[in-house]
Amino acid sequence: MTEGSDGKTIDGMSLKRIENLIDALKDESYQPKPARRTYIPKKNGNMRPLGIPSIDDKLVQEVLRMLLEAIYEGSFENISHGFRPKRSCHTALIQVQKNFTAAKWFIEGDIEGFFDNINHDVLIGILKERIADDRFIRLMWKFLKAGYIEDWTFHRTYSGTPQGGIISPILANIYLDKLDKYMKEYACQFDRGDRRAMNLEYKRYSRKIWWLGTKLKQTEDKDTRKELIDAIKQHQKNRMHLPSVDEMDEGYRRIKYVRYADDFIIGVIGSKSDCEAIKEDIKNFLGEKLKLTLSEEKTLITHGNRKAKFLGYEIYVRPFTDKTLRGEKSGVLIKAYGKKVVLEVPMFTMRDKLLYYEAMEIHQFEGKAKWKPTSRTKLLHLDDLEILDAYNREIRGFANYFSIANNSSHLNSFKYIMQYSLYKTFARKYSTTARKIIAKYRHHKDFAVFYEDKKGGKKMRVFFNGSFKRKTTAMDASCDYVANTIFNTTVSSLIQRLKAGKCELCGATENIEIHHVKRLKDLKGKEPWKIQMIGRQRKTLAVCIPCHNKIHHGIID
C-alpha cells in the first residue's frame, strides 16, 4: 500500500473519515497535503519526478475530476486524444493516418516542460470562464499551491499541476484546449482553394483517351478499332499511375492538427516557408496566451517522405500502387496511384526497450551491430511463474502498443530476443544450459510452466504465443486510456459498502472501515478474510474495527 506524504493509506478508510472530509470541504478548512516526491526511470535513462498525494487528496481530486469532466468533456475538440474516455494513442495515430495522406510537411510539436510550467493564473482564468463557484476555484488554488516534500524538505509550487494528481490530466486538457481551438481557427484562415488544379500530364492523357474514343465511335474497320482500343488501354494504364491533381499547386493549402496530451503533430499541404510561419505563430500564441515555451530545437519541420516522430511511432507519406482497386461491377482497374500515411515501429525503439529490460547485449561483428539475448539478473530471485509472467507482460504490452504499425511483423525480432533471454534466465537460475531448459519446459510446441492455483488444482501457463498481425483500427487495439484507480473499486462502490454498515466478516453493524491489501497474489493461507478477498477478486474488505485489528495482528479466526 503506497503511503502519501501524511503516512496514511486507504487501509482504515471509514464513513466517519469521509464525513470529516466532507465537513472540512464545506467549511473550507480542508487543506491538501504536499505530495511525497519520488522518481521513476524514463526511457532515455533520466529520472521523472512523481508526486504521491495523500489518500484524502486522492479522494477529493477524483470528485473534482468527475465534475471537471462533466463540464468540459463535451466541448473538447475531436483532435484531442490524451486522457479522454474511449480515446488513446491509437485513436490519435489512426486519425493522423486517415487525415494526413496528402501532407507535404510535418511539424512535430514539442512544448518545453509542459506539466511543470502550466501557469496557475492562466489556468484559474480559464476555469473561471466556465465555473462561477468561488469555493470550487478556491479549492483548486489550494491544490495548485500544495507543493511537495522531497528529502523531508517542503517545496512550494509556483507553476504546474498537482504532482501525481488525478486531476492533472484533465487540467492539462482544459489548458491546451485553448491551443486546439486556436489551431481550428488558424486552419480556417490558412486553408486556401476548394480543390487542387488538375495535373497537366494527367489531363493530357485524358484528352488523348477522349480523342481516341471519339475516333473509335466513328470507325467500323476491325483492325483500326483494335489499334484504337489498344492505344486507349495503354493511355489509361499510364494515366492510372499519375496523380490526377497538381500536388505542387500553390493555390491550394491545407493544415491538419492532432494532439495527445502535450504532444502534437501538424500535417501541412503547402511550402516549407508556410511551415516556418505556422511554427512561429504557434510559438507566439503559446508564449503570449498560455505562458508556455515551444522548443525551438525539438519542434521539427520534416518533409512528408521523411520520417517524423509522434507518440513513439515513425510517420511518413509514401505513394502506393494498389492493383486491386477496381470497379465493383466492371472489374476494370480504375485507379493505381495514391498516397498513404505509414506508421512504423522504429528499430531503435525495440533496441532501447530490450536494453532497458537488460534482455540483450549488442556486439560488434565485422562492423555490424549484432543483438545477442542475455539472462536477466534482476529476475533470478523470482519463481518460475513470476519470471514467465514478467516476460509475457512485457512482450504483450510492447506488441499491443505497436500493433497498428505497418511493419508490426518486425515485432517478431523483439519476441525472439525476449524468448531466448527467458531461456538464458532460467538456465542461469538453475545453473544449466538453455538447450536443457527448452527440453525440460517444452509442452507440445510451447514453453510452459505448471503451477497450483489457490484450490490446489494444477494449471499451466505458456510463453507468449500471440500473433503480431497488424491491427487496422483502434477498436482492435486495446485503449490506453487509464481509468483513475484510487482503489481497485470505484469510489461510489467503496462508499456504498461503507454505507451498508455491515462487517463482511462477522456481520457487526458499527464502526465499519476498509481493509486494503497491495496484491491479491500475496495472500496465502486459509483465513476467512483471505478466502473472501481471493474469492471476490477484490483488494478491499469492509470490516468492523475489532475484526480489522485482528487481521493486522494475525489473530482472526
Where are the predicted features?
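Non-catalytic terminal/accessory segments
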Residues: 1-557
